[in-house]
Swiss-Prot record:
One GO CC term on file: mitochondrion
Mitochondrial intermembrane side: 245-262
CDD domains to which the protein is assigned, alphabetical: 5TM_Oxa1-like
Protein species of origin: Homo sapiens
Keyword Mitochondrion: yes
Lineage summary: Eukaryota, Metazoa, Chordata, Craniata, Vertebrata
UniProt name for this protein: Cytochrome c oxidase assembly protein COX18, mitochondrial
Membrane topology: Multi-pass membrane protein
Keyword Flavoprotein: no
Amino acid sequence: MLCRLGGRWLRPLPALQLWARDLPLAPVPTSGAKRPTLPVWAVAPVSAVHANGWYEALAASSPVRVAEEVLLGVHAATGLPWWGSILLSTVALRGAVTLPLAAYQHYILAKVENLQPEIKTIARHLNQEVAVRANQLGWSKRDARLTYLKNMRRLISELYVRDNCHPFKATVLVWIQLPMWIFMSFALRNLSTGAAHSEGFSVQEQLATGGILWFPDLTAPDSTWILPISVGVINLLIVEICALQKIGMSRFQTYITYFVRAMSVLMIPIAATVPSSIVLYWLCSSFVGLSQNLLLRSPGFRQLCRIPSTKSDSETPYKDIFAAFNTKFISRK
């Protein structure tokens, strides 16, 4: 009953170092046209929202200032209209920052997935050894269970260290992408309302004529709701594509999926009340996110990124997604 772990052999029962008691569980505007009215929180100076509050602090924070300078720099360097500057900035940031992090996330998750057979083997052997020791020493079921859990956590942690693939590393994308999304949204809000910026009003005037198509005024909400609905639809597509690829989700994963679906729908009315510049950024960001999600399912791109092959990989991922989508939403009676 030997399992190899990082070049070292797990010894038989006497050397497993099992502990039975006192085991703490580790916590696993266009001219001549009337512009739509923005809600107070979207147009008022930041100080009017909440004096000395978190909103004011965040809107005037250094990261938001940096995001403003990035947007202004791209606009000045390219000479593009503001809708183009927003689009280009979004694509550049997502491509330079979040795409590598997303590839790293898939790399870590692939290594964790490839460890599952070894983890199952260790779990089976450890369970047998704990059962033997429990019979020898007369442990209660509770003591035996705590002993198993403590040692299983230790052994799994050793595997993660050995292969340098702790699952927490896969969350780095969220910790970078979410703050970046918030800072860019606040920066566009400041520029669109003339708040908290020395050149705010001149930029606001440029944004008022910097749109395109049905949203020429980027400082006003999209009265047609096309942009807000598009944001919601793309976000829902991302959620569903991720959900379709997961088989046998845990209860927690199911709750998270429903929560993200609800947030995607809730974002639609929220997006209908903020300046179109912000919603355009949200739309571009979501579209790039969807594109990255699909790109990272390509076997060729995964190989280019040196993402390990796993049992769940498919040679035809896009056909599989379409087939699963068709089965779940179109062919369902």
